[in-house]
Every structure is written in structure tokens, then in C-alpha cells.
Amino acid sequence: MSAVPLKNTDAAHDGVRSISVLGATGSIGDSTMDLLRAAPEKYRVEALTGNANVAGLAKLAKEFNARFVAVADPARLGELRAALAGTDIAYGAGESAVIEAAARPADWVMAAISGAAGLKPALAAVDRGATVALANKECLVCAGDFFMSRAVAAGSCILPADSEHNALFQALASGNRHELTRVIITASGGPFRTWSAADIEQATLAQALKHPNWSMGQKITIDSASMMNKGLEVIEASYLFALSPDEIDVLVHPQSIVHGMVEFADHSVVAQLGAPDMRIPIAHCLGWPDRIVGRAARLDLAKIGQLTFEAPDFERFPGLRLAYDALRAGNGATTVYNAANEIAVAAFIAQKIRFGAIARLVEDTLNAWIRAGNLAPLGSADDAIAVDHNARKMAATLLPQIAAKAS
């Protein structure tokens, strides 16, 4: 049994739906609020959360008349209190308040808090059986088996909000799970798709941040340049759809129009296409099992002219290979992969290591973790958070020698 519904069997939604958005002030949250703004008669906002942008969070709370608002930074409680003065909006600050927001009675929850901080709030929504649009990678990369098992036990419906996984979700509706032979996740190839290994090694921060198609935050843009993001998506797909590593392929598709494909036993391949705009997969989740009017640009294939595909290069982009290695190792290895990558990207942004050293730090951390005998099943959110914490410490310890090798 899967928490991800592969057939649109639910009845259509009637009346007003209650909505909570965890991470309302981030890029995914912004796209979600834009869709809610377009149809205020269909949605009522139950709860909103943000990290530290109190002004933006309070503005959204007032606009949508949210019932509860939480800011993750406990030091911002006074600022939030002042910003909401004169309203009847309830509020709180700190992790417990964010978890309270997630646990409030909303029909549909957008889980878009970035990083490991998003795991416990997402679980709070899952545990009460909510429909959860999942945009937080760490829930799956750091605690995939545990998270999905909890969702099944609680009767929670998980809707993939990431563009590639939402594409697979839509394509999978064309057949049955036992008829699937493989899924194909597409990758733009990032700004270094045609670069040599030597040039990629020396790439600057400014060059890594020039994504050809998507407008995203700094961290994910660098992950796209290294193809670590595609590795994370391979891991997510495995947990979301109960797929083995051998059932997941990656194709480089520079136009970013085909977001995912599913091949079935009869060798039919069903693909989902759309403009590179996060409002498309979010709208699909928000309307599911129905379709709602979109806000993104319509797709004009004649204007695009051609769609091209190529195999990924695991030598120039070893981060993708490492994701498959971590997935096969299991027992927390994917958590280590993600944690080490976050340390490596932060070091690259701080100009402590070269771009090419990102994958080397991830590989060295994974190898050191396995040699130390640290692989073990994750039975709780606290287990996942502990592995994440300790893997970050290990990566930080290995960082100086990685930096020294590159100098």
C-alpha cells in the first residue's frame, strides 16, 4: 500500500477547502499563495509559517485572514506580535509553534519548509491524516522509509509537489504499478552541461548560479549545476513510488519541458510536459483529483521548436552516481549524502573549496561513514535528525583536507 495515490479515484472537492502553508514566505510558498490568491472563494487559510521574514509572513496572514501564524525563529516572537497587533490572528514562535501550525485542522497542507527543520512539521500534518503536498526533500531523502510508513499508517495522502515527481505522479495514473518497468526523471543539465571536467572543477560561484531555465534559490541552483539535485530527486522517487534504483533513469533534457516519463510493460512511454514554472505542479496538487485553472504560461511547442535528450555523464557529474550508491547502501546513507552536500555547498559559497570539490566531500563523507560502521535503520524522526547532525559534523571535519587537496 502506498501513501501516494496512483489513481484519481477520490470524489471531486465541493465547497471551501481549508489550507495550511508551511514555508509560506519561501519560493514554493510564494507560488502556492499566488494560486490561492487567484481563487479566494475556494480556499480558507488555516495556518501559515515562515522562517524569519516576519513582515512578509504578517502581510500574508492579514491578506488571507489566516487563523494561526508561526515564525520558526523564536527570537522574532515580539516582532510578530507587533506586526499582528489589532488582528485576531493567533500566533507563535519556535519549532513547537511551527509543529502546532502543521497539526491544525486543514484539509490540505503544503509542506515547503526547507531543510531538516521541515521533517517534524510534515510528520505532524501526516499523523492527523491530512493531504500533504510534499515539497520538502529532507522528508524523503533523510527519512524516506519511516516517513512513508507513517503516512500509510495515518491514512495521509502524499502528493508530490516537486516538478519531476509530480510529472511521474501524473504519468503513473495512465497505468497500474505492477505494469511499470521504469521511470525517467529529466534534468536540464545546468549551466555546465557542455563544459569539460577541468572547466567544471574551476567553475566560479557566479557561473554556478546562472541556471539556463529555472529561477530558484542559491542552494538549489548550485545543486542543479553539480547535478546533486537530480541525485536527491532519484532518492525521493525511490521512496515516493517504492522503486528500486534500477527502475529509475535520468535523462538530460536542456529545454526543461518534459519533466518526467513512465515506461510501462507494453513499452508505451507516458510523459508530462509543461513550462518550467513551479505553479504547474503546485496547481495539480492543489486541485487534485480535479484540475484547476492555472497561472503559468501555456506551452507553445511550435515556438520551442525542438526537444532534445542525452544521457547524463557520471564522470563529469559524480554527484548523480553517488546518489545511486547511497540509495543502494540504505540505512541512513541517503541522509549522509544530503548532509554532506549541504556542508559542501556552504563551503563553496564561502569560497573555501572549488566547485569540483563538492562531490569529493560528499563521497569522502559517505565512505568514512560506512567504514565507521554507522549505517543503521532509521526508526524515528529523531534518528534521522541525529544522523543528519552527525554527518554534517563528519563532513565539516573532512572539509579542511578536501580544501587542501584542491589548493
Curated annotation (Swiss-Prot):
Keyword Magnesium among record annotations: no
Binding residue positions for 1-deoxy-D-xylulose 5-phosphate: 137, 163-164, 188, 211, 224, 229-230, 233
Catalytically driven reaction(s): 2-C-methyl-D-erythritol 4-phosphate + NADP(+) = 1-deoxy-D-xylulose 5-phosphate + NADPH + H(+)
Pathway(s) the chain acts in: Isoprenoid biosynthesis; isopentenyl diphosphate biosynthesis via DXP pathway; isopentenyl diphosphate from 1-deoxy-D-xylulose 5-phosphate: step 1/6
UniProt keyword Manganese, yes or no: yes
Known EC number: 1.1.1.267
Record-listed Mn(2+) binding positions: 162, 164, 233
Cofactors, names only: Mg(2+); Mn(2+)
GO molecular-function terms, A-Z: 1-deoxy-D-xylulose-5-phosphate reductoisomerase activity; manganese ion binding; NADPH binding
GO biological process: isopentenyl diphosphate biosynthetic process, methylerythritol 4-phosphate pathway involved in terpenoid biosynthetic process
Its job: Catalyzes the NADPH-dependent rearrangement and reduction of 1-deoxy-D-xylulose-5-phosphate (DXP) to 2-C-methyl-D-erythritol 4-phosphate (MEP).
The protein's name: 1-deoxy-D-xylulose 5-phosphate reductoisomerase
Lineage: Bacteria, Pseudomonadati, Pseudomonadota, Alphaproteobacteria, Hyphomicrobiales
